[in-house]
Amino acid sequence: MEKIKISLPIIVEGRYDKSTLSGFVDATIITTGGFSIFNNKEKQALIRRLGEDGIIVLTDSDGGGKQIRKFLAAIIPSDKIHNLYIPCLLF
């Protein structure tokens, strides 16, 4: 299967998210490490730099995902953020 090429970097929450997404998307994928992004100045600087031309934020629809999106919105200009949402699935 050919991977979908995406030019903008994608921000996801964890390693599993990155691993899964890497299976079908050809893009730069950065993990937040969950809430560790709040204190990781190096990762924040990387995300700021990558976000200069735009960035895709793909987080869970739960409370944690919302907090991470809100935090990223505070460090990247809002016109550079493309939020994608993973819906909650109830079984």
Residue locations for each model-derived region?
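A short, flexible N-terminal coil/short beta segment enriched in small residues
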Residues: 1-10
